[in-house]
Regions:
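Sec-dependent signal peptide recognition
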Residues: 2-10
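N-terminal signal peptide c-region/cleavage motif recognized by signal peptidases
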Residues: 15-17
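Secreted/extracellular ectodomain signature
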Residues: 21-184
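Initiator methionine at the very start of the polypeptide chain
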Residues: 1-2, 20
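Short N-terminal leader segment in a subset of presequences, especially plant chloroplast
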Residues: 9-13, 29-31
Length: 184
């Protein structure tokens, strides 16, 4: 089974990965990746020409992690259906967002495919992952709580769990799934 097929199966069965429990600020500091640089992985899925893959790699390197780029195989890279979903808290969430929006915009019959991923350099799965922007903002964390939205990539900090969730929801109207990821 291809990696993309495994990803789609995982997303369809499990939805977005959920953080089992919050971690402390000190634990978070040891789990988070540096906010830069990001590494780009191109997987052309047999639908990208070499020059398109090279161009996509150049564009993708400027996207904040976690990001995924989806294209419609019937329409190609230079289509309105091509979507980059960036600044999510996991690659799975970015992939689901990119595929969902691409499939909604495509005109061709074939389902969209992920052709690029952007992750932190040296990425490995960890119990806590934050988007690049949330990781940068974590530098301002001085206690309280930090909440995240798996679906949208939104986050918010506050003096309490309730304040952090409210700040997360306030960042993005669609962030209805905000949960506390870091709490002291």
């Amino acid at each position: 089974m291809s990696r993309l097929s495994s990803l789609v199966l995982t997303l369809s069965v499990a939805g977005f990965p959920a953080l089992a429990q919050s971690v402390t600020g000190d634990e978070a500091a040891s789990l988070l990746f540096p906010s830069a640089p990001a590494a780009v992985e191109i997987d052309g899925q047999g639908v990208l020409a070499k020059d398109e893959a090279k161009m996509l790699a150049m564009v993708a390197q400027d996207q904040p992690y976690y990001a995924a780029i989806a294209i419609s195989p019937d329409e190609g890279l230079m289509s309105e259906a091509t979507i980059a979903a960036a600044n999510h808290h996991t690659i799975e969430a970015a992939s689901a967002a990119a595929l969902g929006e691409c499939n909604a915009k495509k005109k061709g019959a074939a389902d969209c495919v992920i052709v690029a991923f952007v992750r932190p350099d040296g990425w490995e799965a960890r119990p806590l992952q934050l988007s690049m922007a949330a990781t940068q903002d974590f530098a301002n964390y001085s206690g309280g709580a930090l909440a995240i939205s798996a679906a949208t990539g939104a986050w918010g900090m506050g003096g309490s769990a309730d304040e952090a969730v409210a700040a997360c929801v306030a960042k993005q109207e669609a962030a209805t799934d905000c949960t506390v990821a870091i709490a002291d």
